[in-house]
């Protein structure tokens, strides 16, 4: 098993990078979160990896952090979720966002990831419950039920997770759901 790869970054073509290790170029598929944090071409790079051997291919998947790799490994254990789908999930949302969606059982957030339908999202929520978060070193913020409901409502209305979370932070902690949604919508309308 190849656990880590270090070398010079030779090419960047999302989602694939080419890492030159002493004259040997390794093609590594990375989630977009890792891709955006890569150094410039020609600079030294080090990635944690997961090596997949199939009948027709040998593929290296690279990650910028141990939590990303651990989440990837949890995802590919799920029936019907292969490495490509797991990479898509990690490209569409951060590990923290995924852990939060699993904790709050928010299928709507996972469905927004390209290639993930309702059934797959529900299976992910079911299979990952209790497996993401503290197990892989992710801090999941525990909020009140009303805050969770407000966040879900804003996401359902089409706001991004980031915008909804920012609007939620500006609200008082003990606000009711309906008042919280109204205030958050006013804040987001500005």
Swiss-Prot record:
Superkingdom, taxonomy of origin: Bacteria
InterPro entries: DNA_helicase_Holl-junc_RuvA_I (IPR013849), Hlx-hairpin-Hlx_DNA-bd_motif (IPR003583), NA-bd_OB-fold (IPR012340), RuvA (IPR000085), RuvA_2-like (IPR010994), RuvA_C (IPR011114), RuvA_C_sf (IPR036267)
Location (main, coarse): cytoplasm
Residues covered by region (Flexible linker): 137-141
A molecular function GO annotation: four-way junction helicase activity
Residues spanning the signal sequence: none
An example Gene Ontology CC term for this record: Holliday junction helicase complex
Ranges where the record places region Domain I: 1-64
Residue ranges, annotated region (Domain III): 142-190
GO biological process: DNA recombination; DNA repair
Domain II, as annotated region: 65-137
Subcellular location as annotated: Cytoplasm
Keywords for the protein's UniProt record, in alphabetical order: Cytoplasm, DNA damage, DNA recombination, DNA repair, DNA-binding
Domain notes: Has three domains with a flexible linker between the domains II and III and assumes an 'L' shape. Domain III is highly mobile and contacts RuvB.
Subunit structure and binding partners: Homotetramer. Forms an RuvA(8)-RuvB(12)-Holliday junction (HJ) complex. HJ DNA is sandwiched between 2 RuvA tetramers; dsDNA enters through RuvA and exits via RuvB. An RuvB hexamer assembles on each DNA strand where it exits the tetramer. Each RuvB hexamer is contacted by two RuvA subunits (via domain III) on 2 adjacent RuvB subunits; this complex drives branch migration. In the full resolvosome a probable DNA-RuvA(4)-RuvB(12)-RuvC(2) complex forms which resolves the HJ.
Function recorded in the entry: The RuvA-RuvB-RuvC complex processes Holliday junction (HJ) DNA during genetic recombination and DNA repair, while the RuvA-RuvB complex plays an important role in the rescue of blocked DNA replication forks via replication fork reversal (RFR). RuvA specifically binds to HJ cruciform DNA, conferring on it an open structure. The RuvB hexamer acts as an ATP-dependent pump, pulling dsDNA into and through the RuvAB complex. HJ branch migration allows RuvC to scan DNA until it finds its consensus sequence, where it cleaves and resolves the cruciform DNA.
Similarity comment: family membership: Belongs to the RuvA family.
Protein name: Holliday junction branch migration complex subunit RuvA
Taxonomic classification: Bacteria, Pseudomonadati, Pseudomonadota, Betaproteobacteria, Burkholderiales
Gene: ruvA
């Amino acid at each position: 098993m190849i656990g880590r790869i270090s070398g010079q970054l030779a090419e960047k073509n999302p989602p694939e990078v080419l890492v030159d290790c002493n004259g040997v170029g390794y093609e590594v598929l990375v989630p977009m979160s890792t891709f955006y944090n890569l150094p410039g071409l020609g600079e030294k790079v080090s990635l944690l990896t997961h090596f997949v051997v199939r009948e027709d291919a040998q593929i290296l998947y690279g990650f910028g952090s141990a939590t990303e790799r651990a989440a990837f490994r949890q995802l590919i254990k799920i029936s019907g979720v292969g490495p490509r789908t797991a990479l898509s999930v990690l490209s569409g949302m951060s590990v923290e966002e995924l852990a939060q969606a699993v904790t709050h059982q928010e299928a709507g957030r996972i469905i927004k990831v390209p290639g993930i339908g309702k059934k797959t999202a529900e299976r992910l929520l079911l299979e990952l419950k209790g497996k993401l978060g503290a197990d892989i070193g992710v801090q999941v913020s525990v909020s009140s039920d009303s805050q969770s409901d407000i966040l879900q409502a804003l996401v359902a209305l089409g706001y991004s997770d980031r915008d909804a979370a920012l609007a939620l932070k500006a609200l008082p902690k003990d606000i009711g759901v309906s008042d919280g949604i109204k205030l958050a919508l006013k804040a987001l309308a500005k």
